[in-house]
Structures are given as structure tokens and as C-alpha cells.
Swiss-Prot record:
<dbReference type="GO" id="GO:0009535">
    <property type="term" value="C:chloroplast thylakoid membrane"/>
</dbReference>
<keyword id="KW-0472">Membrane</keyword>
<keyword id="KW-0813">Transport</keyword>
<dbReference type="InterPro" id="IPR016174">
    <property type="entry name" value="Di-haem_cyt_TM"/>
</dbReference>
<feature type="binding site" description="axial binding residue">
    <location>
        <position position="202"/>
    </location>
    <ligand>
        <name>heme b 1</name>
    </ligand>
</feature>
<keyword id="KW-0349">Heme</keyword>
<feature type="transmembrane region" description="Helical">
    <location>
        <begin position="90"/>
        <end position="110"/>
    </location>
</feature>
<dbReference type="GO" id="GO:0046872">
    <property type="term" value="F:metal ion binding"/>
</dbReference>
<keyword id="KW-0602">Photosynthesis</keyword>
<dbReference type="InterPro" id="IPR005797">
    <property type="entry name" value="Cyt_b/b6_N"/>
</dbReference>
<comment type="subunit">
    <text>The 4 large subunits of the cytochrome b6-f complex are cytochrome b6, subunit IV (17 kDa polypeptide, PetD), cytochrome f and the Rieske protein, while the 4 small subunits are PetG, PetL, PetM and PetN. The complex functions as a dimer.</text>
</comment>
<protein>
    <recommendedName>
        <fullName>Cytochrome b6</fullName>
    </recommendedName>
</protein>
<dbReference type="GO" id="GO:0045158">
    <property type="term" value="F:electron transporter, transferring electrons within cytochrome b6/f complex of photosystem II activity"/>
</dbReference>
<dbReference type="InterPro" id="IPR048259">
    <property type="entry name" value="Cytochrome_b_N_euk/bac"/>
</dbReference>
<comment type="similarity">
    <text>Belongs to the cytochrome b family. PetB subfamily.</text>
</comment>
<feature type="transmembrane region" description="Helical">
    <location>
        <begin position="116"/>
        <end position="136"/>
    </location>
</feature>
<keyword id="KW-0408">Iron</keyword>
Length: 215
């Protein structure tokens, strides 16, 4: 194995990269509350893994969505566990994200020169909430259906463009198959991709600027 590693290291300088990653200075004021962002990231990875596993069995149609979720819970090996972990990690991600935002705000981590780091964090917070809204509808049960109907109806109060926004969200005048398809696409592709991109930018800026100092 050492010869294989040496072969790759000679060409890619793996050891230099590893040394750079592992030798970053950590200020002495850093405590357990600075781990909240990392826990949020870990929860996101769990979400991706368990969500990907469920896509093999979930059917995003109004006629089969609920039955496919029931199938995952009752017939798929460990399906109940995978879905439960998905739900638990979703709650964990939201809770840790909120605590992380509070920690950053209270310690002044949003101030110059870290404004862009804060902006990417706020965007990811919006994505996190959007995960919850879109995922809530996917079982297409009574709770999910009426939640979607209420949420997508909120923009109707906006003057001039409200009705157009509602139709855009629903894929039509009423809530139906087009709505479920839109929410499924957002939940499984658009939001994960957007979150991953902003996470990368977030981490690179933290890496470049370092952890903010104490108050």
C-alpha cells in the first residue's frame, strides 16, 4: 500500500494537501458551540444518503406516492429505519442550523470581512427550510396535501404577481400532479445541488479567512 500511496503522492502531492488541511490554526477561544455548523453539515450528508436510498422505491405520482411510502415503511428491508433516520436528521439539521446562526450572530462572525460567508449561510438557511416544506408534501397524505395547498397559496396575497407565482409553484391553478412533480424535483435535485454549491463556497471562505475572533 505504501508504494501505491507513494506513486499517487509523487504525481498529486497528496501529502502536501493533507498537511495543509490538518495544520490550519484553530484559535484558543473556539469551543463546542463552534461545532454546530459541522453538525449541520453532517446532518445534510445523512439526508443525502438516506434520501438517495428512498428514491429507489418512492414514486412521485399522486396515485402512488402514499402507497410507495407505506411500502418503504413496511416491506423494504430496514426501510422504516432509513426513513426514520431521514426524518430525524431533517429535524436535527434545522435545529443545528438555527443554533449555528445564533452562535455566529452573537459572536459577531458576520462582520467584515466575513459578510459573504454570512450571505451564503443565510441562503443555505433558506434552502434548509425549503427542504422541509418540499419534503413534507412527498408522502402526499392529507397533511402533506393541505400543507402544500396552504404554502403555495401564500404568494397570492402579493399584488400584481401573486396569482402568477401561485400558478408557477403549483404548475397550474390547483394542487395536483404538476405540484408534486415540482416539489419532488426541488427536494431531490435543485435544493441539494444549490446547498452543495453554497456549502462549498461557505467552506472555502472560512478556510481562507479563518474563524472569527472572540468578542
Amino acid at each position: 500500500m505504501s508504494k501505491v500511496y507513494e506513486w499517487f503522492d509523487e504525481r498529486l502531492e497528496l501529502q502536501a494537501i493533507a498537511d495543509d488541511v490538518s495544520s490550519k490554526y484553530v484559535p484558543p477561544h473556539v469551543n463546542i458551540f463552534y461545532c454546530l455548523g459541522g453538525i449541520t453539515f453532517t446532518s445534510f450528508l445523512v439526508q443525502v444518503a438516506t434520501g438517495f436510498a428512498m428514491t429507489f422505491y418512492y414514486r412521485p405520482t399522486v396515485a402512488e406516492a402514499f402507497a410507495s411510502v407505506q411500502y418503504i415503511m413496511t416491506d423494504v428491508n430496514f426501510g422504516w429505519l432509513i426513513r426514520s433516520i431521514h426524518r430525524w436528521s431533517a429535524s436535527m439539521m434545522v435545529m443545528m442550523m438555527i443554533l449555528h446562526v445564533f452562535r455566529v450572530y452573537l459572536t459577531g462572525g458576520f462582520k467584515r470581512p466575513r459578510e459573504l460567508t454570512w450571505v451564503t449561510g443565510v441562503i443555505m438557511a433558506v434552502c434548509t427550510v425549503s427542504f422541509g416544506v418540499t419534503g413534507y408534501s412527498l408522502p402526499w397524505d392529507q397533511v402533506g396535501y393541505w400543507a402544500v395547498k396552504i404554502v403555495t397559496g401564500v404568494p397570492d396575497a402579493i399584488p400584481v404577481v401573486g396569482a402568477a407565482l401561485v400558478e408557477l409553484l403549483r404548475g397550474g391553478v390547483g394542487v395536483g400532479q404538476a405540484t408534486l412533480t415540482r416539489f419532488y424535483s426541488l427536494h431531490t435535485f435543485v435544493l441539494p445541488l444549490a446547498t452543495a454549491v453554497f456549502m462549498l463556497a461557505h467552506f472555502l471562505m472560512i478556510r481562507k479567512q479563518g474563524i472569527s475572533g472572540p468578542l
